[in-house]
Every structure is written in C-alpha cells, then in structure tokens.
From Swiss-Prot:
SUPFAM superfamilies: Metalloproteases ('zincins'), catalytic domain
Source domain of life: Bacteria
Protein name: Endoribonuclease YbeY
Family: Belongs to the endoribonuclease YbeY family.
Claim: rRNA-binding is one of the keywords in the record: no
Gene: ybeY
Keyword set includes rRNA processing: yes
Length: 165
C-alpha cells in the first residue's frame, strides 16, 4: 500500500510515523487492500477543529477525521479511448487505487491516551486503524455496523501487538 505521511505539527516522532505506516500496511494486508493508496496528516486540535467544522459541521476538535474518496461522477471511456491513449488505463488504475485521507489530531491522541490509561503509541495506532476502516467503507451508525467495525479494529490492533496495556 502506498501511504503519504504528512506531519503538519512538526511534533510527530520518526517512531510514530514508522509505526503508523507499518500498522496501516498491516491493516491493508488483513483487509485485502494492499494495492490501495491513501494519505495520513498529523494535525493540531486547532486544525482538527477547522476540518471538523468544514466537513462534519461540528464545532469542536476531534481525534480523527476520515475522508473516504468517492468520485462524484463516473468516468466512462470506450475501448477506442483506451486504444488511442494507453496512459488512460494507468491513470484509471491510480484513480481507483486512491481510497482517501486521514487527519489525526496528535493533541487529542495525547489527551485520550491519558484519559483511557494506555500509551500514546496505542492511541495513535487505534486512531489510524479506526480511520483506515472508515475510508474502506466501515462505519458504526448501527449496532450491527459497530460490532463488525470494532471487532475488526480490535483484531487488527491485537494481531499487530498494540493492546490496551
């Protein structure tokens, strides 16, 4: 999986960047998404607040914002189009590969790791996997969806070795 990592805060350690990259690749393997692409941006609470207001109409910071990429209009090409321009197939494959972007608030991750009594590394991993599942179509609006998503989330984190201790 190709993952672009961006640290807008300048506060994320190389270890956390590497853990996030490794964990998301592990999650992609577990869910059959190895050929996909995404981005992860680490932000402050202030930036998280702005994004939450813009995308979710919620006036407060949040821990992770997941923006699933869904083309708004289908792009249709004929066989003749592909024959005339061989680069179209490559472009469409790249287009299909991109699944979305995550914005993780490191401020919220620090707060929540203390609140829940586990490590900052565990919280960052939890938020990355939680967001990853969202941009892959998982949700928790109903009890059934919640059970499916949270079970998979915990399976990934446990198999990777990021437990609540």
């Amino acid at each position: 999986m190709y993952i672009e990592m961006i640290d807008e805060t300048g506060q994320v350690s190389q270890e956390i960047m590497e853990q996030t990259l490794d964990l998301l690749n592990f999650a992609a393997q577990k869910t059959g998404k190895e050929e996909k692409e995404m981005s992860v941006t680490f932000v402050t609470n202030e930036r998280s607040h702005e994004l939450n207001l813009e995308y979710r109409d919620t006036d407060r910071p949040t821990d992770v914002i997941s923006l699933e990429y869904k083309p708004e209009t289908p792009i249709l090409f004929s066989q003749e189009d592909f024959a005339a321009d061989p680069s179209l197939a490559e472009m469409m494959a790249e287009f299909d590969a991109y699944i979305g972007e995550l914005f993780i608030s490191i401020d919220k991750a620090r707060e929540q790791s203390q609140e829940y009594g586990h490590s900052f590394e565990r919280e960052m991993g939890f938020l990355a996997v939680h967001g990853f599942l969202h941009i892959n179509g998982y949700d928790h609006y109903t009890l059934e969806e919640e059970k499916e998503m949270f079970t998979l989330q915990e399976e990934i984190l446990t198999a990777y070795g990021l437990t609540r201790q």
